[in-house]
Regions:
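A transmembrane helix-and-boundary motif of multi-pass membrane transporters/channels
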Residues: 1-220, 224, 228, 235
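Soluble C-terminal extramembrane regulatory/interaction domains of multi-pass membrane proteins
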Residues: 183, 187, 243-270
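Acidic, serine/threonine- and proline-rich low-complexity regulatory regions
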Residues: 226-241, 261
Length: 270
């Protein structure tokens, strides 16, 4: 029985993940063809690496748009730092190594940021390193690597946007439905507080409450992606704010009822 269940889960494919996997292969094919026909140096390996970095990190159009801006900025900053390094200190090994270490430390610090600026760090560090540690680097190397990396980002962006696009607004609808479902389950837990198993009910209640709060956080993230997809022209802003407000009010009402159920009745004074 367990083997049959495991086999069923193994062959049950997620449609969105399957579509995105096919899109990743298509984007890689475009990169290979572009590199072959235009005779890019190193067989266009940095075009292909950039495509894989972008496609394997996100699947939704809104998320890829949002992060691609930051990745482009990262390549610009990395190319500028590399140019200054080649101009000012190269081929001095000590100074070049020092700049690489300090810049990598700064890019790593940015990459660990909780904001969207985190995407600047990895591509900035990669761009700097692949330019400076190349064999006999020059300003031609700077331009070549900069264009190759950004070409990979553009190819990934176009494939994501125009070939079987996976929109954030669709995912947002699903998350809204799941949130309402979890709110319903949370409300059902109130019945358990009237029984003697209140301790067990508390754990179950906290689980559903955490799910609701997690879904609300995902909604905010997806809404930002939806606005990116429409370049800020969507009229969903006020609608989403109203939905978010109502969800919080429902959660607040359920919590008030739970607290009331947990409060022992006061003994009246004689």
């Amino acid at each position: 029985m367990r083997f049959a269940k495991w086999r069923f889960q193994l062959f049950r494919l997620d449609n969105d993940r399957l579509v995105h996997s096919l899109k990743t292969a298509i984007a890689l094919l475009f990169g290979l063809l572009f590199s072959y026909f235009f005779k890019l140096p190193l067989q266009g390996q940095w075009v292909l690496i950039s495509i894989l970095v972008v496609m394997c990190a996100q699947s939704r159009v809104g998320a890829i748009l949002q992060k691609s801006y930051m990745r482009f900025l990262g390549t610009v900053i990395g190319a500028i730092v590399a140019s200054l390094t080649l101009w000012l200190v190269y081929p001095n090994v000590v100074y070049t190594t020092l700049i690489l270490c300090v810049a990598t430390m700064l890019f790593s610090y940015i990459a660990d940021s909780p904001s969207t600026w985190s995407e600047v760090g990895p591509l900035g560090a990669v761009t700097l390193v692949v330019i400076v540690v190349a064999q006999n680097p020059s300003f031609n190397t700077v331009m070549s690597r900069f264009l190759e990396i950004n070409l990979g980002i553009v190819i990934a962006l176009l494939v994501s946007r125009f070939i079987w696009p996976l929109h954030s607004r669709t995912q947002l609808r699903y998350i809204l439905i799941h949130t309402l479902h979890e709110l319903k389950n949370l409300a059902k837990q109130l019945e358990a507080f009237t029984s003697v198993k209140a301790d067990k009910a508390d754990k179950s209640y906290e689980l559903f409450e955490d799910n609701v709060l997690n879904y609300i956080g995902i909604q905010k993230k997806l809404f930002d992606e939806v606005m990116r997809e429409t370049f800020g022209r969507s009229n969903l802003g006020q609608i989403f704010q109203n939905i978010l407000y109502e969800e919080r009010e429902i959660l607040r009402g359920i919590n008030l009822m739970k607290n009331a159920a947990n409060t022992p009745p006061k003994v009246g004074a004689n």
